A protein has these predicted regions:
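Surface-exposed, glycine-biased beta-strand/turn segments
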Residues: 2-83, 116, 125, 154-186
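Generic beta-structure capping elements
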Residues: 41, 59, 90, 101, ...
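Conserved, short, structured surface segments that act as functional micro-motifs
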Residues: 86, 94, 112-172
């Protein structure tokens, strides 16, 4: 298989990855994160319960960005999540949860309209996060008809974020994946 054919297959994979119609299209909450750097931890047991989120490792103080255009529904200090943000999308269909923040962006308050990619906070290790492992705990919830910030159906953010990163071409394909495709094709 030629390198050109392998590149075309990668392109087709990217197009397919971006076509999941039932999931929200989101931006990365941490600029520069690549799809291959993510690890699915949704079903892992953390502190006695299912994690239902993804942890994105980043240095303390790294900007956290809104993944969609929306409204800050709730800023909340919790024992487990520390400084948290609950963002609703414009349709009120999904809630995006950002936790363990070092701090919020200046001027951010409940009811603030935010744009996709806008800085809303900074990575930290507040709540029950280890100071040795600062990260963003990121979750997605499908809201019910009541649209409560504290209640929704958890959606695994890993495949949603991975597909969005690949589809947006913000993620480079590691050379080892191309080589594996070439090897598999014989």
């Amino acid at each position: 298989m030629s390198l050109r054919l392998a590149a075309q297959q990668v392109e087709v994979s990217r197009e397919r990855a971006g076509s999941a119609a039932s999931e929200p299209a989101i931006a990365s909450p941490i600029q520069g994160v690549k799809a291959y750097q993510l690890r699915d931890s949704f079903n892992e047991i953390h502190h006695g319960h299912r994690h239902e989120a993804i942890d994105i490792m980043a240095p303390t103080g790294t900007p956290v960005r809104a993944v969609v255009d929306g409204t800050i529904q709730k800023l909340f200090l919790s024992k487990a999540g520390g400084n948290t943000i609950y963002e609703f999308d414009d349709e009120g269909e999904y809630c995006y949860y950002y936790a363990h923040l070092e701090r919020y962006a200046d001027g951010l308050h409940e009811g603030t309209r935010v744009s996709r990619g806008e800085v809303i906070g900074y990575v930290g290790s507040t709540g029950d996060a280890s100071p040795a492992a600062p990260h963003l705990h990121f979750a997605i919830y499908l809201l019910g008809p009541q649209r409560h910030w504290w209640r929704g159906t958890a959606i695994d953010p890993y495949p949603v974020l991975e597909r969005s990163l690949i589809a947006s071409r913000s993620s480079s394909v590691p050379i080892y994946l191309i080589l594996e495709m070439l090897h598999a094709a014989g």
